[in-house]
């Protein structure tokens, strides 16, 4: 079991555990992606850091993209007073949410490969 798998398993909030588990599975399905715990949360990278999943209040998580300001302007990407990072807050997992995250992650991967 990897440190990220252990992190997910140890989460006390079962709803956040469910969200992160499904997002982790989705992100790890992309070729050339690896994961590692940094700052006590899961980070996903290829050549460089691409994104991380951060538990937030109200039973949600935020998928934060390191180079969020360079991504196509999607209304779901929120800056929250950050200069580089943009994130998408998630409170429920469904096909629409997974499709959105996959689309943004694919764009972030392409940006990473071309940098």
Regions found by a protein language model. Name each.
Residues 1-115:
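Charge-dense, helix-prone N-terminal extensions
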């Amino acid at each position: 079991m990897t440190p990220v798998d252990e992190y997910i398993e140890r989460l006390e909030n079962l709803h956040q555990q469910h969200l992160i588990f499904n997002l982790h599975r989705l992100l790890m399905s992309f070729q050339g992606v690896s994961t590692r715990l940094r700052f006590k949360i899961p980070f996903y990278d290829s050549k460089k850091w691409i994104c991380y999943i951060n538990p937030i209040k109200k039973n949600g998580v935020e998928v934060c993209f390191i180079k969020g300001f360079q991504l196509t302007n999607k209304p779901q990407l929120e800056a929250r007073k950050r200069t580089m990072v943009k994130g998408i807050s998630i409170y429920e997992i469904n096909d629409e949410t997974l499709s959105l995250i996959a689309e943004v992650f694919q764009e972030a991967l392409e940006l990473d490969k071309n940098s």
